[in-house]
Amino acid sequence: MLSAQLDEYLAEMNLSATTEQKKQLVGFVEMLNKWNKAYNLTSIRDPQQMLIRHIMDSLAVSKHLVGERFIDVGTGPGLPGIPLAIMNPERSFVLLDSLGKRIRFQKQVQHELGIHNISSVESRVEAFEPEVKFDGVLSRAFASIEDMLHWCHHLPSETGCYYALKGQLADNEMANIPQGFEVTDIIELQVPRLDEQRHLLRVIKK
């Protein structure tokens, strides 16, 4: 059932995936559903809704990524980082979260599904100092762009940028962009079977 739905949604989004990638995406949903019963990793309980609201919602960003090295800040159970890593095996993703149970889940996913381009780190964002800066800083965890730029200012490389995954944009969201930053793109994302607004904001340091 999930496999058939995934095929349908990928076709709607014009995304191509190998048999192995599809197997990993479905496997991730199945593991998330299983672990969620004990670890409370997401408020969404229905695997079919997980596929839409977690997997496809994450993959809507995929074609907009530029660069090789990414960090997903406040990744939770690995969103959007794990679906993006599955679909972009040539890129590397650091998954950052401060809760140990989430990191344990991510590492089990990595082991069971054979995902080799992710690295899970248990840390608060302000305490994490990367040896090499990132081409892209991703997050769907922050309430505002302002918060994201404040807490993640030390993560991108000189040419790197921020990718903020948002729902409906607040009227004052753009007005509160701190000095020294510029919003280069506001992209309206289309997620199959999701009748809610989704946006991707790309921000750079001036």
Curated annotation (Swiss-Prot):
Key words of the record: Cytoplasm, Methyltransferase, rRNA processing, S-adenosyl-L-methionine, Transferase
Subcellular location: Cytoplasm
TM region positions: none
Record-linked InterPro entries: rRNA_ssu_MeTfrase_G, SAM-dependent_MTases_sf
Origin superkingdom: Bacteria
Binding site for S-adenosyl-L-methionine: 74, 79, 125-126, 140
GO cellular component terms, A-Z: cytosol
EC number in record: 2.1.1.170
Pfam families named in the record: GidB
Group of enzyme by EC: transferase
Catalytic activity: guanosine(527) in 16S rRNA + S-adenosyl-L-methionine = N(7)-methylguanosine(527) in 16S rRNA + S-adenosyl-L-homocysteine
Single GO term (MF): rRNA (guanine-N7-)-methyltransferase activity
PANTHER family to which the protein is assigned, alphabetical: S-ADENOSYL-L-METHIONINE-DEPENDENT METHYLTRANSFERASES SUPERFAMILY PROTEIN
Function: Specifically methylates the N7 position of guanine in position 527 of 16S rRNA.
Family to which the UniProt record says this protein belongs: Belongs to the methyltransferase superfamily. RNA methyltransferase RsmG family.
Protein name: Ribosomal RNA small subunit methyltransferase G
